[in-house]
């Protein structure tokens, strides 16, 4: 029987592997919505994440709050995950992904072919386009990208993307920035059970307890941005999310007790002290 110490050590040493690249942290974070670049830097450090997603469109612009974003992060310590946020069509997403790959190379990550694929024509609910996502993924895979697609919690689409060659699938827990938590638990569980690539739950997580819940379900990793960046104290929330992610992973590997409809005593019933008195 494994001891708690042995299980913990093995868990911490077992890496998350995406497209052949190993990561020890299972929490990914972003760069958007922070009040200042300094707060973003502190939060990234506190989270202990190793993958940071960056919107290619944000880095390309010189608008206030965007300038110097890429340079504010030490890309020797963390892996860049360029994303195609803002793209409404498959064609647009492919073009932006190509820019993202070049951007990663300019920042010193010559072998970085990662892209977080987002095709979102819906501006109100920010729900991803399944057809456009699959079309863009197929093209990007042909061009040698490691594609991490953001999708609805659709088990059939997840399998199609996996079969197309995607490096992960990234089902949403609930709409981006909503903080509604895991609203698609049944479908996400099906995706996890049937996937042979890492499943990264992306969007909707609002609290560390929800992050733990997602990892307890068997997710391989989480991508959390808004819940950290919009917290009253982002660095502290980032630390909490990092700890919650690790805690949930350990709980999943340890295995929870089965639920029962009746009580079971914690103490043994054998050897009870006779408390009755004889007359």
From Swiss-Prot:
SUPFAM superfamilies: ThiG-like. Its EC number is 2.8.1.10. Pathway: Cofactor biosynthesis; thiamine diphosphate biosynthesis. InterPro entries: Aldolase_TIM, Thiazole_synthase_ThiG, ThiG. It catalyses: [ThiS sulfur-carrier protein]-C-terminal-Gly-aminoethanethioate + 2-iminoacetate + 1-deoxy-D-xylulose 5-phosphate = [ThiS sulfur-carrier protein]-C-terminal Gly-Gly + 2-[(2R,5Z)-2-carboxy-4-methylthiazol-5(2H)-ylidene]ethyl phosphate + 2 H2O + H(+). It is an enzyme of class 2 (transferase). Its main location: cytoplasm. Coiled coil: none annotated. Pfam families: ThiG (PF05690). Belongs to the ThiG family. HAMAP family: ThiG. Catalyzes the rearrangement of 1-deoxy-D-xylulose 5-phosphate (DXP) to produce the thiazole phosphate moiety of thiamine. Sulfur is provided by the thiocarboxylate moiety of the carrier protein ThiS. In vitro, sulfur can be provided by H(2)S. Homotetramer. Forms heterodimers with either ThiH or ThiS. This is Thiazole synthase.
């Amino acid at each position: 029987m494994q001891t708690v110490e042995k299980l913990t050590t093995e868990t911490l040493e077992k890496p998350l592997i995406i497209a052949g690249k190993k990561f020890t942290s299972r929490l990914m974070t972003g760069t958007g919505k922070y009040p200042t670049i300094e707060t973003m830097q502190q939060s990234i450090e506190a989270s202990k994440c190793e993958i940071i997603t960056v919107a290619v469109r944000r880095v390309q612009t010189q608008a206030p709050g965007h300038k110097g974003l890429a340079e504010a992060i030490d890309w020797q310590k963390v892996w860049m995950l360029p994303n195609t946020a803002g793209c409404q069509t498959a064609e647009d997403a492919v073009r932006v992904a190509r820019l993202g790959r070049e951007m990663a190379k300019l920042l010193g990550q010559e072998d970085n072919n990662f892209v977080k694929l987002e095709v979102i024509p819906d501006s109100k609910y920010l729900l991803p386009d399944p057809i456009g996502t699959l079309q863009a993924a197929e093209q990007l895979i042909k061009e040698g990208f490691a594609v991490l697609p953001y999708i609805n919690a659709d088990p059939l689409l997840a399998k199609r993307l996996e079969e197309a060659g995607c490096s992960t699938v990234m089902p949403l827990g609930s709409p981006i920035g909503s903080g509604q938590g895991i609203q698609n638990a049944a479908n996400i569980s099906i995706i996890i059970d049937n996937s042979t690539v890492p499943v990264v739950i992306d969007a909707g997580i609002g609290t560390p307890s929800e992050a733990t819940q997602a990892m307890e379900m068997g997710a391989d990793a989480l991508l959390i941005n808004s819940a950290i960046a919009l917290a009253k104290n982002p660095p502290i929330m980032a630390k909490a999310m990092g700890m919650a992610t690790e805690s949930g992973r350990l709980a999943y590997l340890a295995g929870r007790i089965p639920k029962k409809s009746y009580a079971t005593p914690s103490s043994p019933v054998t050897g009870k002290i006779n408390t009755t008195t004889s007359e």
